[in-house]
From Swiss-Prot:
UniProtKB keywords: Methylation, Ribonucleoprotein, Ribosomal protein, RNA-binding, rRNA-binding, tRNA-binding
Keyword Plastid: no
CDD domains recorded: Ribosomal_S12
Biological role stated in the UniProt entry: With S4 and S5 plays an important role in translational accuracy. Interacts with and stabilizes bases of the 16S rRNA that are involved in tRNA selection in the A site and with the mRNA backbone. Located at the interface of the 30S and 50S subunits, it traverses the body of the 30S subunit contacting proteins on the other side and probably holding the rRNA structure together. The combined cluster of proteins S8, S12 and S17 appears to hold together the shoulder and platform of the 30S subunit.
Organism from which the protein derives: Proteus mirabilis (strain HI4320)
GO BP annotation list: translation
InterPro entries: NA-bd_OB-fold, Ribosomal_uS12, Ribosomal_uS12_bac
Top-level taxon of origin: Bacteria
The protein, known as: Small ribosomal subunit protein uS12
PROSITE patterns linked to this entry: RIBOSOMAL_S12 (PS00055)
The encoding gene: rpsL
Any one GO MF annotation of this record: rRNA binding
Cellular component, GO annotation: small ribosomal subunit
Subunit structure, interactors included: Part of the 30S ribosomal subunit. Contacts proteins S8 and S17. May interact with IF1 in the 30S initiation complex.
Length: 124
């Protein structure tokens, strides 16, 4: 425990909290342009072809973003919106593509959990 005199000379330093999503710069989402759309394999023990795209953001950052849902219409030069949220089994992928915003379409024939995949309520 520090004495009062020690605290007067040098106050306590607060912990620096490091962001998990530095490219967003404290914004909820950021717009960017796809520079490459590709599939990659997850780390052990999972096995799949995960859809990922490399995105050049409006602030100059270049990041990898995961494309969730079944099927997508993204290609090079598509303008997309990204949000934070990492993919646990893909190293280096710390962002998600927002479905149903800008050039990224919603998931086709999606009935449940629609809001996460940019799908409007189907006509009854």
């Amino acid at each position: 425990m520090a004495t009062i005199n020690q605290l007067v000379r040098k106050s306590r330093s607060s912990k620096v909290v490091k962001s998990n999503v530095p490219a967003l710069e404290a914004c909820p989402q950021k717009r960017g342009v796809c520079t490459r759309v590709y599939t990659t394999t997850p780390k052990k023990p999972n096995s799949a072809l995960r859809k990922v795209c490399r995105v050049r953001l409006t602030n100059g950052f270049e990041v990898s973003s995961y494309i969730g849902g079944e099927g997508h219409n993204l290609q090079e030069h598509s303008v997309i919106l990204i949000r934070g949220g990492r993919v646990k089994d893909l190293p280096g992928v710390r962002y998600h593509t927002v479905r149903g915003a800008l050039d990224c379409s919603g998931v086709k024939d999606r009935k449940q959990g629609r809001s996460k995949y940019g799908v409007k309520k189907p006509k009854a």
